[in-house]
Amino acid sequence: MITLSNKKNKLNEHKNSLCVTYPRTVNIIFGHYPYPEVIHSFLLEIKNNIDPEMENYTHVKGGMTNWHYFLKNDLFTNFMTYIINKHQTSHPDIFEYFLEKRTIREAWGNEVKSGDHLNPHIHNHIHGILYLTEGCDLILPDLNISITPHPGDYYM
């Protein structure tokens, strides 16, 4: 049995990641953003800013904001700050000096209604998703896993 001697140490925070190899290797960093009022604000931002020209434009066949809608948005900035602070000790290769080493090129929101769907696709770079509502499972067939998300859950 291992006991942590300094329980107030910042390194003792609960962090989650899963490394999956089937047939490729992917490290999935995940957690829960514990601010329901912010999740609700994200929902309203998306609902009120759907761009009709972006509908069905990506693999998500539903409503979408502009590709860059959230880049300068305080809700998104605060969410990213939370993610960086939460995971920089467990994943320094990604999150240490994140804002100095990396550029977030796009940050948008999707609205998926009944009858909308998602086409299978793959991401080759770091990407993430913050779930704002209950929905269907996130199925990753190339990793042979299925994820059941809840509002506030994020995956990178």
Regions found by a protein language model. Give the residues of each.
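Catalytic core of non-heme Fe(II) oxygenases with the double-stranded beta-helix
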Residues: 97-156
